[in-house]
């Protein structure tokens, strides 16, 4: 029976992945800031605490979804937190996974790691431009380092770059916009031809599991 370790299982996408895994024949362990009494949990705050090697014991596949995405209240501290959580902790986890003999490491990154679309066209896997913000830059840096770890080991590294994720209980700007529309805050706007790529959270978690 396969054993999976999930980081970020309390988040929007991670909680749906956990629900999907509950319906499969597998063993599940979690890496979280707070204990989950329903699962074997290693309590660890990524970017602040050292990750225990024991968290990777007997794990076949790691689903790494945890990351730092927003902090509008403390801009002076943002850069350091992004680096420590999105890059340093990701690399630390992957290196421990290699030590523990983990076979697959699945990193849920972001479409922002690929930078903006080139010449207004849809992006593909081979399109790469410079990420605009610190979030995209740190996700890209983590991707590069993970691929290098994968090349130097027997652990297979997969990277998924989701576009904007929507679905029940979604957080972030999309949810704020939809709430504003429902409350009548947004007047009707003329057609301007803007398009935005999106993916439903359940489609995303099925894709994540398919990669495993």
Predicted regions and their residues:
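N-terminal Rossmann NAD(P)H-binding glycine-rich loop of SDR-like oxidoreductase domains
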Residues: 3-24
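Catalytic helix-loop patch of NAD(P)-dependent Rossmann-fold dehydrogenases
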Residues: 84, 118-165, 170, 186-190
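Conserved Rossmann-fold NAD(P)-dependent oxidoreductase catalytic core, especially the SDR/UDP-sugar
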Residues: 91-134, 150
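Alpha-helical substrate-binding/gating segment
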Residues: 178-186, 196-212
């Amino acid at each position: 029976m396969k054993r999976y370790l999930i980081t970020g299982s309390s988040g929007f996408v991670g909680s749906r992945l956990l629900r999907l895994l509950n319906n499969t024949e597998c063993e599940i362990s979690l890496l979280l800031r707070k204990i989950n009494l329903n699962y074997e949990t290693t309590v660890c705050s990524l970017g602040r605490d050292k990750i225990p090697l024991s968290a990777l014991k007997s794990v076949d596949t790691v689903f790494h979804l945890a990351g730092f995405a927003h902090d509008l209240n403390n801009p002076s501290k943002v850069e350091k937190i992004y680096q420590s959580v999105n890059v340093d902790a990701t690399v630390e986890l992957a290196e421990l996974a290699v030590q523990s003999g983990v076979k697959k490491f699945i990193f849920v990154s972001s479409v922002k790691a690929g930078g903006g679309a080139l010449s207004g066209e849809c992006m593909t896997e081979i399109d790469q431009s410079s990420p605009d913000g610190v979030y995209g830059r740190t996700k890209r840096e983590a991707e590069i380092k993970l691929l290098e770890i994968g090349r130097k080991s027997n652990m297979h590294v997969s990277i998924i770059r989701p576009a904007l994720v929507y679905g029940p209980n979604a957080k972030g700007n999309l949810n704020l916009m939809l709430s504003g529309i429902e409350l009548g805050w947004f007047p009707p706007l003329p057609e301007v031809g803007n398009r935005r790529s999106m993916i439903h959270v359940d489609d995303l978690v099925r894709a994540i599991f398919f990669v495993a």
